[in-house]
């Protein structure tokens, strides 16, 4: 198991593919598995590796709490796809002190080249397999509660304003008015979003911008698809 060399573009690509249908390295909450892989990555993945970049930024937000995240940090080779070998840090000997340098290391260099060739072959095979599979897009179904100011608010106009919000990765669904008391009704509206493109913060910001109609917005239900 592993991701190849996480300091290389090929290794980051493996990580990106692995996270295409996952929020975390293991399970459904941040854990020491995420910390171990995060620390092996030298910096933010490029923008075209959207799944890896999403995960990196999310785990980075736990920087102060990482020691308290659940689980036990294990070797990198215990995480990731089963058919990829971990090679991150295989070049760490470059940082040794001069006293530790093997002046007769030609055999090791030959072995290193052989290991590199095998690794590149395995990664090429893995990429070939992944290329044949359709990319999975992580989506969520969200139910929003949109509350008006009072019973005189034009709810038809309020819904028109909400549905006027358009974004790549956002699809509006069914809606209904739900009584909340004192003659006031709230708008309950369903939407499906692509997780990497649309978030609840963005929805709240744009919906509450219609301040003539909208008092507040809450997430009533959130489910991964």
UniProtKB/Swiss-Prot annotation:
The family database entries (InterPro entries) matched by this protein are listed as: eEF-1beta-like_sf, EF-1_beta_acid_region_euk, EF1B_bsu/dsu, EF1B_bsu/dsu_GNE, Glutathione-S-Trfase_C_sf, Transl_elong_EF1B/ribsomal_bS6, Transl_elong_EF1B_B/D_CS
Q: Which SMART domains match?
A: EF-1_beta_acid, EF1_GNE
> What keywords sit in the KW lines?
Acetylation, Elongation factor, Isopeptide bond, Phosphoprotein, Protein biosynthesis, Ubl conjugation
- Modified positions (Phosphothreonine) in chain numbering: 88, 93
* Region (Disordered), start-end ranges: 80-114
Question: PTM per UniProt?
Answer: Phosphorylation affects the GDP/GTP exchange rate.
Q: Which PROSITE patterns match?
A: EF1BD_1, EF1BD_2
Q: Give start-end positions of Acidic residues composition bias.
A: 96-113
Q: Which CDD domains does this one have?
A: EF1B, GST_C_eEF1b_like
Q: Which parts of the sequence belong to the GST C-terminal domain?
A: 2-84
**Which residues are reported to carry the modification Phosphoserine?**
8, 42, 95, 106, 174
| A Pfam family that the UniProt record links to this protein | EF1_GNE
Residues with the modification N6-acetyllysine, per the entry, are 7
Q: Annotated Gene Ontology MF terms?
A: guanyl-nucleotide exchange factor activity; translation elongation factor activity
Say if the entry is tagged with keyword Protein biosynthesis: yes
One GO cellular component term, please give it: cytosol
Covalent link (Glycyl lysine isopeptide (Lys-Gly) (interchain with G-Cter in SUMO2)) residue numbers: 147
Q: Which family does it belong to?
A: Belongs to the EF-1-beta/EF-1-delta family.
Subunit annotation: EF-1 is composed of 4 subunits: alpha, beta (alpha subunit of the eEF1B subcomplex), delta (beta subunit of the eEF1B subcomplex), and gamma (gamma subunit of the eEF1B subcomplex). Interacts with elongation factor EEF1A1.
What exactly does this protein do?
A: Catalytic subunit of the guanine nucleotide exchange factor (GEF) (eEF1B subcomplex) of the eukaryotic elongation factor 1 complex (eEF1). Stimulates the exchange of GDP for GTP on elongation factor 1A (eEF1A), probably by displacing GDP from the nucleotide binding pocket in eEF1A.
User: What's this protein's name?
Assistant: Elongation factor 1-beta
Q: Can you name the source organism?
A: Oryctolagus cuniculus (Rabbit)
Q: Which gene encodes it?
A: EEF1B
């Amino acid at each position: 198991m592993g991701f190849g060399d996480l300091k290389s573009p090929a290794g980051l690509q493996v990580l990106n593919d692995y996270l295409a249908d996952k929020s975390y390295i293991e399970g459904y909450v941040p854990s020491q598995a995420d910390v171990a892989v995060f620390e092996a990555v030298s910096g933010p993945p490029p923008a075209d590796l959207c799944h890896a970049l999403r995960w990196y930024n999310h785990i980075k937000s736990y920087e102060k709490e990482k020691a308290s995240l659940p689980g036990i940090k294990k070797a990198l080779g215990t995480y990731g796809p089963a058919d990829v070998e971990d090679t991150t840090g295989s070049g760490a000997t470059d940082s040794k002190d001069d006293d530790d340098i093997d002046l007769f290391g030609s055999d090791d260099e030959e072995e290193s080249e052989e290991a590199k060739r095998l690794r590149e072959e395995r990664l090429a095979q893995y990429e070939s397999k992944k290329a044949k599979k359709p990319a999975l897009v992580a989506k969520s179904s969200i139910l929003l509660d949109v509350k008006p100011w009072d019973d005189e608010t034009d709810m038809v106009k309020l819904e028109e304003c909400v549905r006027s919000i358009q974004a790549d990765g956002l699809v509006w669904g069914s809606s209904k008015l739900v009584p909340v008391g004192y003659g006031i009704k709230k708008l309950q509206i369903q939407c499906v979003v692509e997780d990497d493109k649309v978030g609840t913060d963005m929805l709240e910001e744009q919906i509450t911008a219609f301040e003539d109609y909208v008092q507040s917005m809450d997430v009533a239900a959130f489910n991964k698809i």
